[in-house]
Amino acid sequence: MAVAAPLFGKLALQGPRAEMEDDMELEEGRIPEFTFAAVYDGHAGISSVNYLKKELFSECVNALQGGALLQSDNSIDLEAALSQAFVQVDKRLLSWLEQQEESDRESGSTATVMFLGKEKVVVAHVGDSRVVISRGGKAEELTSDHRPYGSSKTALAEGKRVIAAGGWISNGRVCGNLAVSRAFGDISLKSRRKEMLEEGLKKNLWTQKFVSKRDLTGEWLTAAPDVTAATLGQDAEFIILASDGLWDSIKSKDAVAFVREQLKEHGDIQRACESLAAAALAQNGQDNISILIADFGKVARVDGLAQHQDVSAGVKQVLVTSGILLLGVYASHLASLIR
């Protein structure tokens, strides 16, 4: 059953970081029956993020045959098309990075994109930005973080994949360098691995024996995405798409509960988005934060919610502090616009 056309709230904050390396994209009306949304979380500069904003949407649409494959129930074709789009854009990005100044050449980025229709949502992602649906107040994660550390099923599988391809995991990072196991760009872990190993040898970071055991034919770091399609249904209340700056501070279930309380209180999805960002900062958030929320209008406003007590302890804590920090959120947002 179809859901109502969503209202969107979105906010990007630099937070305490010296640079803003996050960005997001929202394209409405450019694909029949679907809206495109994306969050890009860059590292070692913003150049890869800027490239993805220019190239990834159009490449995905072309691979999806103008959006026709989004209407199909053939998950194999859908996954193949989006995987092709991601990999092709990454190949072009690597060639482009080779031509850039040294300060921009080493950049990379995660990418989490979703195609939101009336009856289903399709998500493709590399990295650790996350998509979460609220279904009747229950959090359903549509993505699994591509990180090479931790005990989750995905983390263990990603670590094994990197090692099987000839790379290694050190201090929870791919080759001791990158905290995500899938990403766009990062030429030192792709097309310039030989040069990276030679440089490390000069700096005594590893031995010649260690270098000789590295397999340079496999993909240590890949831009091939995981692709998920989910039916929305009448229990779908809203969808949160956000960078790890949110999820490292607030659990998925608490983010869903927080947004529901906000919508019950005032019904404004933009205010809810801003308050959620403030809540992440209140939880000692140390990263850039980008949040986009699609609200299907299912959470009814409740008068007199200030006296509402049926909230978890974690959500109560962020509710108390987020209001105080909203002025800081606005100030940070304005500062990022000026920059």
Cite the ranges covered by each PLM segment:
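PP2C/PPM-type serine/threonine phosphatase catalytic domain
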Residues: 1-339
